[in-house]
């Protein structure tokens, strides 16, 4: 069940999987403001919801979202919320509440893909929602540790379930048209969403320092996100226009990894 049946990974869903999607207000949590830009009504409604959320918190809009969504008619063996909520004033998430309030199932599971203590998710309303699940699945040991520091009473419910990776497919993709880097320079690669928590600004400032020491290094950024223009502006201000290359969102980021000298991670927080 998808709030909005869009995104780069839609084509990866096997044909035998039955995809459902909603037409309630929850669909706006599955789209960006840019996604709505071609339909003025959707653009306006999502913008209003996001503004109210920013001013008064997600708890101010959840009753409206829930009233717009009917209870799903099918009773399931298990319902899984695969997206955690973020900070209470971010227009993000809502899947936990959807599963708890609008899905009938024998068991309900919530996945965690964040550092619960650092990303702003540790708040009264999010904590109350997690108490309603039978199991919380954390994607790593560190992710679980952060969560149970916030909610030690749920330690028995919280299990580690690592993310699934298709290693052979990844190796094959890395071998498909590997990106060729110029000789004579150190090529550093970051593959990340260009958002605050990824700390790409720190990488750019570090690059400026290293180049000032006379080291010829280029930073390659694969990904897009809300901070892209801000990061471009920072690169320009530091005189790094030729040293920071924005490759945008790539269907196959692995081909950039094949020949890179260094893979860099500068996240402020992560579910590691």
Model regions and ranges:
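N-terminal strand-loop element at the rim of the active site
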Residues: 1-60
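Short N-terminal targeting/anchoring amphipathic segment
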Residues: 50, 54-58, 67-91, 109
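Nucleotide-sugar donor phosphate/pyrophosphate-binding loop at the beta->alpha transition
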Residues: 91, 95-96, 107-109, 113-128, ...
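Carbohydrate-associated surface elements
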Residues: 142, 164
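Nucleotide-sugar donor-binding and catalytic loop/hinge architecture
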Residues: 172-187, 211
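A conserved mid-protein helix/loop that constitutes part of the nucleotide-sugar donor-binding site
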Residues: 186-209, 215, 226-232
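Active-site donor-binding acidic/aromatic loop of nucleotide-activated sugar
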Residues: 219, 227-230, 241-250, 256
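Short Ser/Thr-rich beta->loop micro-motif in glycosyltransferases that lines
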Residues: 248-249, 265-271
């Amino acid at each position: 069940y998808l709030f909005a049946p869009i995104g780069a990974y839609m084509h990866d869903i096997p044909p035998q999987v039955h995809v459902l999607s909603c037409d309630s207000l929850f669909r706006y949590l599955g789209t960006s403001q840019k996604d709505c830009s071609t339909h003025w009504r959707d653009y306006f409604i999502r913008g209003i919801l996001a503004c109210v959320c920013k001013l008064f918190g997600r708890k101010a809009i959840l009753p409206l979202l829930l009233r717009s969504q009917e209870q799903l008619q099918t009773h399931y063996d298990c319902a899984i919320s695969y997206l955690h909520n973020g900070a209470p004033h971010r227009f993000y998430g809502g899947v936990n509440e959807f599963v708890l309030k609008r899905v009938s199932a024998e068991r309900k599971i919530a996945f965690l893909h964040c550092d619960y203590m650092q990303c702003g998710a540790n708040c009264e309303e999010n904590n109350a929602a997690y108490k309603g699940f039978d199991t919380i699945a954390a994607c790593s040991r560190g992710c679980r540790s952060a969560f149970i520091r916030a909610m030690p009473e749920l330690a028995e419910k919280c299990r580690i379930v690592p993310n699934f990776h298709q290693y052979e497919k990844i190796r094959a993709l890395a071998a498909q048209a590997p990106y060729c880097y110029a000789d004579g320079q150190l090529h550093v690669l970051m593959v990340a969403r260009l958002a605050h928590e990824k700390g790409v600004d720190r990488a750019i400032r570090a690059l400026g320092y290293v180049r000032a020491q006379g080291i010829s290094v280029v930073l390659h950024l694969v990904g897009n996100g809300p901070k892209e223009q801000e990061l471009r502006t920072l690169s320009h201000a530091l005189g790094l226009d030729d040293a920071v290359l924005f490759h945008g969102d790539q269907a196959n980021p692995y081909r950039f990894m094949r020949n890179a000298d260094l893979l860099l991670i500068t996240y402020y927080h992560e579910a590691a």
